[in-house]
């Protein structure tokens, strides 16, 4: 039996624009992804006695989850059929706009794909079958994604403020599918693909002036998001404050570590009803 321990980092959408809808009702998105040092941990046992995916601190089905779906897809393209069991230690908030399930699936795809020498293009195709955020999570680097998550542009030279605090209302969660199903706006955001910035300052201006198109829908289900964003935007030295993904997690981004730490310390003292993480962009 072989045992592997792998990390799955959380993602944050610095902006998220909805630019249209396909006939199958999937939405076209354009989003700037970053990944932060808040991780789920996956203990992967290969050729052991057990099969399935086990979550140490959440009640999630061991067969009906993104990690198990990814394993089943990978096994169809492998010459071996080992027993695989995974114990997932969840640190990323569930149903919170941080792509925890997608990150976990991407982590197992990376591990088994490399182990079984599966082609990188095929891995990306399989990742998209698991979920629209999984191809981006497979990269786990700063990137711009468009379409339904399949079209990715890596941005290795983009220098961003690195220090971030994540804030979510305690005990609240939001289903991604629920939020998208209630997104009824037909006045979609204009695509920015033909005018993506080249210069660093232009990227910073784009990020600052962008938004999350899912915010209004999320507010209908978790109105506490509005107060969180109001407080975050008032923090000293904050660059931007915004909701990530389909919510309900929000973030505040800072240039200096001390500014982020002071802000998080203040929030922990004054808002015990919020879950707060200090993090750094990878």
From Swiss-Prot:
Pathway: Isoprenoid biosynthesis; isopentenyl diphosphate biosynthesis via DXP pathway; isopentenyl diphosphate from 1-deoxy-D-xylulose 5-phosphate: step 3/6. GO terms for biological process: isopentenyl diphosphate biosynthetic process, methylerythritol 4-phosphate pathway; terpenoid biosynthetic process. It comes from the Bacteria. InterPro entries: GHMP_kinase_C_dom, GHMP_kinase_C_sf, GHMP_kinase_N_dom, IspE, Ribosomal_Su5_D2-typ_SF, Ribsml_uS5_D2-typ_fold_subgr. The keyword Nucleotide-binding applies. ATP binds at residues 93-103. The active site is at residues 11, 133. Keywords: ATP-binding, Isoprene biosynthesis, Kinase, Nucleotide-binding, Transferase. One of its GO terms (molecular function) is 4-(cytidine 5'-diphospho)-2-C-methyl-D-erythritol kinase activity. It catalyses: 4-CDP-2-C-methyl-D-erythritol + ATP = 4-CDP-2-C-methyl-D-erythritol 2-phosphate + ADP + H(+). Its EC number is 2.7.1.148. Belongs to the GHMP kinase family. IspE subfamily. Catalyzes the phosphorylation of the position 2 hydroxy group of 4-diphosphocytidyl-2C-methyl-D-erythritol. This is 4-diphosphocytidyl-2-C-methyl-D-erythritol kinase. It comes from Ehrlichia canis (strain Jake).
